[in-house]
């Protein structure tokens, strides 16, 4: 099993927060500060991201899913609340399909049931092409701007930029391949957990 960084703060029922494309556990700092008084907050850095940036990245959602489930099992976390953002939302959907009995409640935040979502600001292939043309830093900045109504002026924009800078070109491209090739529509019916879907009206 790969060794990845997993933040672990607070006490109580575990709350697992899974970041998305060009993210890291740092993005959850405001949530950690709030929720650690009520939950044991678990924040993994996915392979190739954040403090796991020396770990080989994956190019499919299923393998990341399996890794996270294995890591949680190793930490003896067998019942938890689960939230995923964007690509992380794809991962948590697969976690719920595979190990739904371990998940108390599920939150899908700014995500969908397939990687190539209609209405995305650009196709995944365009994202891959822009990554190659513009490089990681500009791509990370452009992606992070889409996460906030205020764009670069948002309070936590800089945290997101720093997270993106810790990623390699290979990891970023592998993640885009994983997103493009993932489609969970046909297996949505396998999610039996009580689920909250959070989708901003300007997303």
Regions found by a protein language model. Name each.
Residues 116-122, 133-189:
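Conserved alpha/beta-hydrolase catalytic His-Asp/Glu region
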Residues 93-98, 103-134, 138:
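Flexible "cap/lid" loop of the alpha/beta hydrolase fold
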Residues 30-33, 42-83:
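Active-site loop/oxyanion-hole signature of alpha/beta-hydrolase fold enzymes
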């Amino acid at each position: 099993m790969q060794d990845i960084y997993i933040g672990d703060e607070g006490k109580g029922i575990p709350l697992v927060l899974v970041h998305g494309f060009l993210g890291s556990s740092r993005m959850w700092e405001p949530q950690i500060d709030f929720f650690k008084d009520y939950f044991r907050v678990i924040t993994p850095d996915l392979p190739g991201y954040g403090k796991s940036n020396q770990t080989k990245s994956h190019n499919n959602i299923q393998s990341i899913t399996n890794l996270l489930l294995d890591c949680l099992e190793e930490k003896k976390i067998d019942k938890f609340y689960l939230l995923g953002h964007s690509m992380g939302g794809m991962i948590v959907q697969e976690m719920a399909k595979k190990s739904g009995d371990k998940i108390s409640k599920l939150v899908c935040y700014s995500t969908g049931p397939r990687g190539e979502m209609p209405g995305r600001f650009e196709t995944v292939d365009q994202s891959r092409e822009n990554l190659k043309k513009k490089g990681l830093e500009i791509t990370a900045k452009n992606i992070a701007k889409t996460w906030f109504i205020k764009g670069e002026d948002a309070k936590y924009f800089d945290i997101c930029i720093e997270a993106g800078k810790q990623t390699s070109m290979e990891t970023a491209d592998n993640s885009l391949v994983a997103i493009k090739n993932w489609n969970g529509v046909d297996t949505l019916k396998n999610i039996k957990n009580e689920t909250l879907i959070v989708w901003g009206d300007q997303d």
